[in-house]
Regions:
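Rossmann-like dinucleotide/flavin-binding elements
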Residues: 5-8, 13-39, 132, 138-161
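Short hydrophobic core segments
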Residues: 12-14, 106-119
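Short amphipathic alpha-helical segments
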Residues: 24-25, 48, 124-127
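N-terminal glycine-rich anion-binding loops that anchor highly charged ligand groups
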Residues: 36-48
Length: 161
């Protein structure tokens, strides 16, 4: 990591899923001037979800991309600085913390919130991606409702399925 600091911020948020945008909303309301880097998939995993029926405030449901856009707009309304970029290196050994963005820009931050989310593990079988969200699911808790009273196959091991 370079010793050259390109920018100093009070609050740096890495990730733009529900946790990242929620952190940006609260940090903005607390006048922490948050800078949020969206990462490799702006909006996070929910952008690949067709229908979200279990999020409070949306009694008729909402698509994942629409929900994430609503959260992003709310964070922007409160003053969050949302940028595209990927955190490629971190030095969290001592405050202020140093985060390298896109292998080039070094940001020094008083506070770092890491909200990088999760990535589903798939089997890698033919047509699996083709049917993601249309029969192939990576979240039994999230999507089980859609398959009630239907014959399903659940694949997993240990405490995950």
């Amino acid at each position: 990591m370079s010793d050259s600091i390109n920018e100093k911020v009070r609050c740096l948020i890495i990730g733009s899923g529900p946790a990242g945008y929620t952190a940006a909303i609260y940090a903005s309301r607390a006048n922490l001037s948050p800078v949020l880097y969206e990462g490799i998939q702006p909006g996070g995993q929910l952008t690949t979800t067709t229908e979200v029926e279990n999020f409070p405030g949306y009694p008729e449901g909402i698509t994942g991309p629409e929900l994430m856009e609503d959260l992003k707009q709310q964070a922007l309304r409160f003053g969050a600085d949302i940028r595209f970029g990927i955190a490629t290196e971190t030095d969290l050994s001592a405050a202020p913390y140093k985060i390298t963005i896109d292998g080039e820009k070094v940001i020094e931050a008083e506070t770092v919130i890491i909200a990088t989310g999760a990535t589903a593990k798939y089997l890698g079988i033919p047509d699996e991606n083709k049917y993601a969200g249309m029969g192939v699911s990576a979240c039994a808790t999230c999507d089980g409702f859609f398959y009630r009273k239907k014959v399903v196959a659940v694949v997993g091991g240990g405490d995950t399925a």
